[in-house]
Structures are given as structure tokens and as C-alpha cells.
């Protein structure tokens, strides 16, 4: 392997989310900051909200004056 061409590897990179330490991983950066992770994502917490949106077909029909 050639020397001095590979990035520095940190065995214990700390992942932060919302100001608190989430986990430790290996990375090319000493710290990682994330906005969304499984502890707060609506899919994993069960707090998903269903939006009351118009269906694609109805929107298409209305847009092109069909029906």
C-alpha cells in the first residue's frame, strides 16, 4: 500500500444528535452530527401523521378537465 494517500481513520468517532451522544462508530471524521436518527424519526416512534391529501388520479383528472 502507498503511504500518505489514505484518509486518517478514527476507530471511535462519536455520533451526536440533538446535542447528545448517540453511538460510537469508525469513520474518517472524529465527530459526526446528525439531525434525524431512529430514536426520533416518526416511522420508528409510531408518531406518524397521515396527511389528508388529494389522490394523484383525482388531481390529474381535475387538472386536465376530465370527468
UniProtKB/Swiss-Prot annotation:
Keywords assigned by UniProt, alphabetized: Chloroplast, Plastid, Ribonucleoprotein, Ribosomal protein, RNA-binding, rRNA-binding
Main subcellular location: plastid
SUPFAM superfamilies documented for this protein: L28p-like
Biological process per Gene Ontology, one example term: translation
Gene3D superfamilies: Ribosomal protein L31 (4.10.830.30)
Cellular component aspect of the GO annotation: chloroplast; ribonucleoprotein complex; ribosome
MF GO annotations: rRNA binding; structural constituent of ribosome
Quaternary structure note: Part of the 50S ribosomal subunit.
Functional note: Binds the 23S rRNA.
Family: Belongs to the bacterial ribosomal protein bL31 family. Type A subfamily.
Full protein name: Large ribosomal subunit protein bL31c
Source organism (scientific name): Cyanidioschyzon merolae (strain NIES-3377 / 10D)
Amino acid at each position: 500500500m502507498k503511504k500518505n494517500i489514505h484518509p486518517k481513520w478514527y476507530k471511535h468517532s462519536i455520533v451526536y444528535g440533538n446535542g447528545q451522544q448517540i453511538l460510537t462508530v469508525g469513520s474518517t471524521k472524529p465527530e459526526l452530527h446528525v439531525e434525524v436518527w431512529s430514536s426520533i424519526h416518526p416511522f420508528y416512534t409510531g408518531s406518524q401523521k397521515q396527511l389528508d391529501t388529494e389522490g394523484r388520479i383525482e388531481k390529474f383528472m381535475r387538472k386536465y378537465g376530465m370527468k
